[in-house]
Amino acid sequence: MPKIEVLYCVLDGDIRHIAAHLPQPRPDVAYLVAWQQRGGEEQNAPGELLQRDDVKILVHKSIGLSKNRNFALANATGDLLILADADNIYIYEYFDRLLAAAAAHPEAGILLFQAAASEGSLMKNYPAAPCTYAERPRGSYFSSWDIVLRRSAALPRFDERFGLGAEHLGCGEEEIFLEQASRGGCRIVYTPQVIVTTRAATTGDRFWSDPKVRRAKGAVLCYMHGPLGATLRCLKFAAVQGKASVGQRIRALYDMIWGIFYLKFSR
């Protein structure tokens, strides 16, 4: 039977949230905690995690969520890898759904699912029917907690210019990762079933307050559609934001265009 490995990527004190949510041990599930520590005094892991034989904790000093995910993937040993945040909650039923989908799609290198908020509502407007990533409805996108990776597949690394903790682009790493994988020939299949509950907010909620999120939107559009296509989409996006002030829209457009140029000329 395939082994599931939940890859928790956490920073400093966020590790404390994991212990409260772990289900009882299960022979086909293991947990890898990639724990970034930013320096200063040495931090101790919660005793509840240290007592679990199914939990491995690896400490490193890098900065940035994408770097942490790459670190976790490089050290993973399971067959099916779940990308997890500290606030994610898993139950046996979710693992069973994942295993069933993986068995139904042995050709898929990446499996996509749904996430639910703690009160039961879906975290976003997901496609209603199963589909491949290439055939997904327009406007559909997926977050890290929706993604399960087959370790044996040819997978890209996360682009470390994107994501929380990155210098300029504060999100978008999942969209770039999935697009790179798809272009590289990896088959990606979506199953409309919930496999995780979370209390976390999406980075899209910070669009108007965080310039790094706005820059990332421009950069992601540039990767997907090229500089010209991205610029036209940014102009349209800024024009239709009727609830935002003129100043907010100008600032958003500036940051998105900045992101386009950054992606085009950086590496």
Regions found by a protein language model. Name each.
Residues 164-179:
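Acidic donor-binding loop at a coil-to-helix junction in glycosyltransferase catalytic cores
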Residues 93-126:
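Conserved donor NDP-sugar-binding/catalytic core segment of glycosyltransferases
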Residues 81:
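Short aromatic/hydrophobic "clamp" motif used to bind/position activated sugar donors
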Residues 119, 131-150, 162, 168-169:
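A recurrent flexible, glycine/aromatic-enriched loop bordering the glycosyltransferase active site
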Residues 60-76:
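Glycine-rich, basic loop-to-helix element that forms the pyrophosphate-binding segment
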Residues 18-59:
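Acidic donor-binding segment of Leloir-type glycosyltransferases
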Residues 208-267:
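Non-catalytic, C-terminal membrane-associated alpha-helical segments of glycosyltransferases
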Residues 185-197, 210:
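Catalytic beta-strand/loop signature of glycosyltransferases that borders the donor
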